[in-house]
Amino acid sequence: DRSPSRGLGDVYKRQDYKDQGDIEVEIWRKYILNCAFNVMTAFYDNTIGELRRDPVKAQQYEKLVWEAASVGQAKGVALTDEHINEVIHKFRHVHADNATSSLQRDFRIRRKQTELETFSGYIVKEAKRLGVSIPLSEKIYQGLMEMAEKF
């Protein structure tokens, strides 16, 4: 078969292009990382190292990752346990101890315009819409909203 589409498919394979599902998974892997990374560093005003060293905070970080992933899965994103565990591995072993987040820095300077809705509000609203339970995400979002109201 020498059809143009077959030839194009061969080019894509050689170039290691990803299909739409792969792209969606990659976007959500990055997103679920940020749902925990930005939210936890801002909520506690801690570096990643400080979060890692506190067993309660580390457990909360990982729970936020799983909660965000459950919303992605409910939306039909093909996130696997392996994808989710890779995000958790980055938290435990890859991110620099002194790493902070843009949301944390926004909260430190009491900036009115933040990424709170992007990394927390959206996931909470989508979970409600989809009937997915994410109690820790809801609790921390509410706490961050209360903090932001004082800016």
Q: Would you name each region that the model predicts?
A:
Residues 24-49, 56-69, 95-96:
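Active-site-proximal catalytic alpha-helix in oxidoreductases
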Residues 62-151:
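NAD(P)-dependent Rossmann-like dehydrogenase/reductase catalytic/cofactor-binding core
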Residues 51-55, 106-107:
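Short coil/turn segments at secondary-structure junctions
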Residues 19-21:
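Short loop/edge segments at beta-strand edges and connector loops
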Residues 1-12:
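Single conserved hydrophobic/aromatic residue that forms the stacking wall/gate
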